From Swiss-Prot:
Presence of the UniProt keyword Isomerase in the record: yes
Lineage: Bacteria, Pseudomonadati, Spirochaetota, Spirochaetia, Brachyspirales
MF annotations from Gene Ontology: glucuronate isomerase activity
Gene of this entry: uxaC
Entry EC number(s): 5.3.1.12
Any one GO BP annotation for this protein: D-galacturonate catabolic process
HAMAP family registered for this protein in UniProt: UxaC
Pathway: Carbohydrate metabolism; pentose and glucuronate interconversion
Coiled-coil regions listed: none
Family: Belongs to the metallo-dependent hydrolases superfamily. Uronate isomerase family.
NCBIfam families (alphabetical): PRK02925.1
UniProt-recorded name of the protein: Uronate isomerase
PANTHER family: URONATE ISOMERASE
InterPro entries for this protein: Metal_Hydrolase, Uronate_isomerase
Length: 468
């Protein structure tokens, strides 16, 4: 019988162990998409207790606490940090088979050298040991420990990026660090014309860009202005979230009329919304191509399903789910149209619905180019798919339909500084898959060859992809 989560956790063959210990675990981390707060990095934040670093803002854990009958007071309410910690510890034993069960134990092991099984009997021991370690742990210590080479934060076009500037000039409180912290351009609020605060947001964009946004052309100009600003501060990537993929072409005059209706807070129908989004996305794709920015597209998240709780707590609090729309046909038209209008940038496609992996992977193969290796990427298993089964499925589908060796690998997509252990989780799974292939004679048992593929997926590919 194997020991629970020992050093060979998830490594079920000797080749996998060799690949992990000699190659994967030595690689730096290129975390090209996350939701870390750059202010906390700049200020070299020190966390007051394990609840703050483990549970604050982590809606993955919040969902499971609710499912386990924990009152909201102990999740997002005014209970003490200790009581919230106890509520989470009571939840964990019921999560067997859930990735949070593995992640939570891995976080305790790697950050705090705590190897106890999480349960109520061990709660006070874990609380005391972790808090003792946190007295001498800052963000800078975490980034150094996990060899974090690059952090790509997620930023609104109106952000002034003051903390990115301070960090990369070595003038922030954190001082000079090995880690590069770069902004990513996420214009969702300028795309989502149907939102009630759209016109207010455009005024904010107007102030940030110092461009009078009076029509669709000046809106495009303002967005391009902010892309240039982001680029000047090291931005290498954009991102957008699409619950459904729009495609409905119309002439610029009609798009301008739709935009002006929205600015006057007039109601828009679905056709108006789709036409506007199609137009703006094509304009952004063109600019990303010209600016050599990677475009990340996150598709099929159905957000804020529970209106009662959305009104109480706002977005990103655990009330999103997997969407189930047919994305491929319209995505094909969108890519085809943008490609005809100057070409496509490098694009990473993510879907929250795993049924889209085969269609996405084969569609992106239609837009690969000989000049750039792996120009189009099937993104790592995301959010609800970000578990062992989901990672294995994404890796194998990519291998079956494309070039796994060119994959840009894992990202945290997280708000927590404890999430770097997820890179280890992914790396173990990757090494186990390739090791199993080697042990079965399906690929050459050439450790140097396989090791180079592991190193490339874990770090080298992303470093080249985002920096060339």
């Amino acid at each position: 019988m194997k020991t629970f989560m020992d050093k060979d956790f998830l490594l079920y063959n000797e080749t996998a162990k060799t690949l992990f210990y000699n190659y994967a675990c030595k690689c730096p981390i290129f975390d090209y998409h996350c939701h870390l707060n750059p202010k906390e990095i700049a200020e070299n934040k020190k966390f007051k207790n394990i609840t703050e670093i483990w549970l604050y803002g982590d809606h993955y854990k919040w969902r499971m606490m609710r499912a386990n009958g924990i009152d909201e007071k102990f999740i997002t309410g005014d209970a003490s940090d200790y009581d919230k910690f106890i509520a989470w510890v009571k939840t964990v034993p019921n999560l067997i088979g859930n990735p949070l069960y593995h992640w939570s134990h891995l976080e305790l092991q790697r950050y705090f050298d705590i190897h106890e099984v999480i349960n109520e009997d061990n709660a006070d021991t874990i609380w005391e040991k972790a808090n003792q370690k946190l007295q001498n742990m800052t963000v800078k210590d975490i980034l150094k420990k996990f060899k974090v080479h690059t952090i790509g934060t997620t930023d609104d076009p109106t952000d002034n990026l003051e903390y990115h500037k301070l960090i990369n000039e070595g003038k922030a409180q954190i001082g000079k660090i090995y880690t590069k912290v770069v902004p990513s351009f996420r214009p969702d609020k300028a795309i989502n014309i149907e939102m009630p605060d759209f016109s207010d947001y455009i005024k904010k964009l107007e102030n940030a860009s110092k461009i009078n946004i009076k029509d669709i052309n000046s809106l495009t100009e303002a967005l391009y202005n902010r892309i240039d600003y982001f680029k000047s501060l090291g931005c290498v990537s954009s991102d957008c979230s699409l619950s459904i993929v729009p495609f409905n072409l119309d002439d610029e005059k009609n798009i301008d009329a739709i935009f002006k209706k929205a600015m006057n807070k007039e109601s828009l129908n679905f056709e108006d919304i789709e036409k506007y989004k199609t137009y703006i996305l094509i304009k952004l794709i063109k600019k990303y191509k010209e600016s050599n920015l990677v475009m990340q597209i996150h598709i099929s998240a159905m957000r804020n399903n529970n209106e009662v709780m959305f009104k109480k707590l706002g977005a990103d609090t655990g009330y999103d789910s997997v969407g189930d729309s047919n994305i491929i046909e319209k995505l094909s038209f969108l890519l085809k149209t943008a490609n005809n209008d100057g070409g496509l940038p490098k694009i990473i496609f993510y879907s929250l619905n795993h049924k889209d992996y085969y269609p996405l992977s084969t569609l992106m193969g239609c837009f690969q180019e000989g000049s750039i290796k792996g120009k189009m990427q099937l993104g790592s298993a995301w959010w609800f798919c970000d578990n062992r089964d989901g990672m294995e499925e994404q890796i194998k589908i990519l291998a079956n339909t494309g070039s796994l060796a060119l994959f840009v690998g894992m990202l945290t997509d997280s708000r927590s500084f404890l999430s770097y252990s997820r890179h280890e989780y992914f790396r173990r799974i990757l090494c186990n898959i390739i090791g199993e292939w080697a042990d079965k004679g399906e690929v050459p048992n050439d450790i140097k060859y396989l090791g180079s593929i592991i190193e490339n997926i874990c770090f080298n590919n992303s470093n080249i992809y985002f920096n060339n």
